[in-house]
Amino acid sequence: MEITEEEQIPPILQRVRCGVVEGFLTVFKMIKFVLPLYIVVDMCKAYGVIDSLGAWCAPLMSLFGLPGATAFAFIAGALVNLYAAIAVLAPLDLTPWQVTQCGVMMGIAHNLVLEGGVLSSTGARGGVLTLFRILLAAIAGWLMLGMQALGVAG
């Protein structure tokens, strides 16, 4: 079977150019969202807002061995997306292990509103699955805290 001219794969240079352009467009979309959020969080940190509000959330976050300020990253990740969570986490003074722990927990439970709605629209029980994801993220956080306490990681 012979391949016609319309069915041919575009030349490699054209594919690379297209990929680079699409990559830059994606990066610029992310920067437009993440950079302002990062600046706001950094300003809130500089003026003590994060510390004050973080103290209020500290009891909950201490269950996972995390500072109270990380609660805002979890809220941003749950309500918006992971890019918002990263923008909130970036200016915080976290250890590499704490960043990993937050990443695992948020990887399990992120964008809950939108994804819960999508699940519900497919006939699944979106609310139940959303609660399950939150519970699973909490269990993962506790397990990682335990690993750190045992000296296995972190």
Locations of regions flagged by a protein language model:
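Alpha-helical transmembrane segments of polytopic integral membrane proteins
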Residues: F33, L37-V40, I50, L82-A85, ...
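Membrane-interfacial helix-loop connectors
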Residues: D51-H110
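Hydrophobic alpha-helical interface/terminus motif in multipass membrane transporters
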Residues: V40, C44, V88-L89, V118-L119
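Membrane-embedded alpha-helical segments and adjacent helix-loop junctions characteristic
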Residues: I3-A76, A153-G154
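Alpha-helical transmembrane spans of integral membrane proteins, capturing the lipid-embedded, hydrophobic core
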Residues: M30-Y38, A78, T130-A138, W142
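C-terminal transmembrane helix pair
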Residues: A87, T95-A153
